[in-house]
């Protein structure tokens, strides 16, 4: 992996708790990323931080390192009860909460601090059983946390650290009232360490967030470069009739190792999945109504390489740490210009190079001016030869719900086309 995204600043240069240093070095973390190097001097001195950095720059480890150091360096409140966690990390989605929990486990193993996880969808009793034994760091989504708090399974009166991750999405999804409800049940802002991290922070979000922070320091990485320097951006203008064939031709030509294809609706994602599955690709489907256990399984298959292509709505665009994604396709240009940044941020992570390809079709081309205004540059336009598009394509598979026995499963196809089936003659014109 490329190290060019790291700074000369080492974690060991900071006055971090020795167990935190041990946990970081055990996982191979020695040098800080820019956002970590900027944030840690403040958080380690007890100052609140609002951090903005593009996706994949180490925001999660910045706040986890700060959280564990703070808890190890400060005693628990006197009289703390079993149902009172010491730190609360709020995430907008179940998938992100699960990922943060996984990233925190190495720190927990070394330090002995206990983790809890609380998210909706399933696992209610399993999550509750862990909480009943007492946890130090509770990671979760607002709805399930409020549920537990109202039933007194969780009491927030001993919170010493609170983190809002992907804060802009928290507010965009309408969680403002939930967040305020939770904050009202914590100690005052000046009695805890507060951190807020996100790839994009609007003025509205900062104002709302700062209501619950204590004179926070604002730190940012590359504020004028909203898309990563290592991401090659490319744009095509297909007709609606040629759009699917262009996508399949580009996949055939690029033959990417690990790809995410974004579309704007569940039904469009299902259509793309059906065409690619029928064409022999190992493809997974991730939309909002996929059951939680299946979502986690699909993400695990994609991460392990058992699935090569993930077709997704924006549910997968925020916060998921999927390594080595080589390509992102915007089959539809997003309606929200900020989602463009989050989508293509799935590639080019941790110093690697990435490739983003967007299709500006007749339906969504009107979204392009707002996107280019937001990212501060025009996306390079490429041309293609209609006569060179693939034509020998099978009819798409149709998604069968509530199906048992044989047949295509929702969310996956296990047969990747062999390299021998690729056509060497299908090329796009420059």
UniProtKB/Swiss-Prot annotation:
Stretches for region Disordered: 388-430
Record-level GO BP terms: RNA catabolic process
Originating species: Erwinia tasmaniensis (strain DSM 17950 / CFBP 7177 / CIP 109463 / NCPPB 4357 / Et1/99)
Protein name: ATP-dependent RNA helicase RhlB
Family membership noted in the UniProt record: Belongs to the DEAD box helicase family. RhlB subfamily.
Renumbered ranges of motif DEAD box: 165-168
Subunit structure: Component of the RNA degradosome, which is a multiprotein complex involved in RNA processing and mRNA degradation.
EC assignment: 3.6.4.13
NCBIfam families associated with the record: PRK04837.1 (NF003419)
């Amino acid at each position: 992996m490329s190290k060019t995204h790291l700074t000369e600043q080492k974690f060991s240069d900071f006055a971090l708790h020795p167990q935190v240093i041990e946990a970081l070095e055990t996982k191979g973390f020695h040098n800080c990323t820019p956002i970590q190097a900027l944030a840690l001097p403040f958080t380690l001195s007890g100052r609140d931080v609002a951090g903005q950095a593009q996706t994949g720059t180490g925001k999660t480890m910045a706040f986890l390192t700060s959280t564990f150091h703070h808890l190890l360096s400060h005693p628990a409140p006197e009289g703390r009860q079993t149902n009172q966690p010491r730190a609360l990390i709020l995430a907008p989605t179940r998938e992100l909460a699960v990922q943060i929990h996984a990233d925190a486990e190495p720190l927990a193993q070394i330090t002995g601090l206990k983790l809890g996880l609380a998210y909706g969808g399933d696992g209610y009793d399993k999550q509750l059983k862990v909480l009943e034994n007492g946890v130090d760091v509770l990671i979760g989504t607002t709805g399930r946390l409020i549920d537990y708090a109202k039933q007194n399974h969780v009491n927030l009166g001993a919170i010493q650290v609170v983190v809002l991750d992907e804060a802009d999405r928290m507010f965009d999804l309408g969680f403002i009232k939930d967040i305020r409800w939770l904050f009202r049940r914590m100690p005052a802002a000046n009695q805890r360490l507060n951190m807020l991290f996100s790839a994009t922070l609007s003025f509205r979000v900062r104002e709302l967030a700062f209501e619950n922070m204590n004179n926070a320091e604002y730190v940012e990485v590359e504020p004028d470069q909203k898309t990563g320097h290592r991401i090659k951006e490319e744009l095509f203008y297909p007709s609606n009739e040629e759009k699917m064939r262009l996508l399949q031709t580009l996949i055939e030509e690029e033959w990417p190792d690990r790809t995410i294809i974004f579309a704007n609706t569940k039904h469009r994602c299902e259509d793309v999945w059906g065409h690619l599955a029928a064409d022999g690709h190992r493809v997974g489907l991730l939309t909002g109504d996929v059951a939680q256990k299946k979502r986690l399984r699909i993400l695990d298959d994609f991460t392990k390489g058992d699935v090569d292509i993930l077709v997704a709505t924006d549910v997968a665009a925020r916060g998921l740490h999927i390594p080595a994604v080589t390509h992102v396709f915007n089959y539809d240009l997003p309606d929200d210009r900020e989602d463009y940044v989050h989508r293509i941020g799935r590639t080019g992570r941790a110093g690697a190079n990435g490739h983003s390809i967007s299709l500006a079709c007749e339906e969504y081309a009107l979204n392009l001016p707002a996107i280019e205004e937001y990212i501060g540059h025009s996306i390079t336009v490429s041309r293609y030869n209609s006569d060179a598009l693939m034509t020998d394509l099978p009819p798409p598979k149709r998604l069968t719900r509530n199906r048992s026995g044989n047949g295509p499963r929702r969310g996956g196809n296990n047969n990747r086309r062999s390299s021998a089936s690729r056509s060497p003659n299908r090329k796009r014109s420059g």
